[in-house]
């Protein structure tokens, strides 16, 4: 892909998806390789801090400083709100899903329960998470639907169809707030 883009005088930014230590993730970033990776280590620490009331912000601060120590202040790592392998942030923030349930159980939950957002505070939590991701070093990456609070448990429930219209008031409000953060 990069060779073709170089011949045409264009640059293609390539970001990877690797779970593991900072060293493992960094090993795929180099000239002729990936430009960046999703920062899952930061995401996995940010998720409970923003989704729950009980988590300590120091945990997030430590994870952010570890990310900066490994990738530098001016890096291209992806600050994600979620991805296709994880349940949706808003379903954690809503309290529908918890952090104690085994990861593979979320797949069954997605098939057997109608996961919807019940707690409107979850939209505010997601807005704060967006603001955090857009103001720290790296590139903010919003998983489709997270701009308005699409719920979901495990795969395939977290891959619901994107809604482009007829959003609920609180979904439209979050979408507008997210749009404001971007512009």
Which role does the model predict for each range below?
Residues 1-80, 132, 149-180:
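Active-site-proximal helices and loops of the catalytic beta/alpha 8
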Residues 116-117:
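Short, solvent-exposed helix-loop connector elements
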Residues 126-128:
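Conserved interdomain hinge at the start of the Helicase C-terminal
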Residues 29, 79-111, 130-172:
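Aromatic/acidic polysaccharide-binding cleft in carbohydrate-active enzymes
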């Amino acid at each position: 892909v990069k060779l073709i883009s170089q011949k045409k005088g264009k640059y293609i930014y390539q970001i990877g998806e690797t779970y593991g230590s900072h060293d493992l993730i960094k090993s795929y970033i180099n000239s002729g390789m990936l430009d960046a990776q999703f920062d899952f280590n930061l995401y996995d620490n940010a998720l409970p801090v923003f989704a729950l009331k009980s988590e300590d912000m120091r945990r997030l601060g430590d994870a952010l400083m570890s990310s900066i120590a490994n990738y530098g202040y001016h890096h291209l790592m992806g600050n994600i709100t979620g991805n296709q392998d994880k349940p949706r942030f808003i379903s954690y923030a809503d309290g529908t899903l918890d952090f104690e349930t085994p990861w593979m159980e979320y797949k069954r939950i997605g098939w057997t329960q109608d996961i919807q957002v019940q707690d409107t505070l979850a939209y505010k939590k997601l807005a704060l998470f967006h603001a955090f991701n857009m103001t720290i070093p790296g590139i903010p990456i919003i998983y489709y639907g997270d701009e308005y609070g699409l719920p979901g448990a495990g795969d395939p429930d977290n891959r619901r169809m994107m809604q482009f219209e007829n959003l609920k008031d609180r979904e439209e409000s979050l979408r507008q707030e997210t749009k404001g953060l971007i512009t």
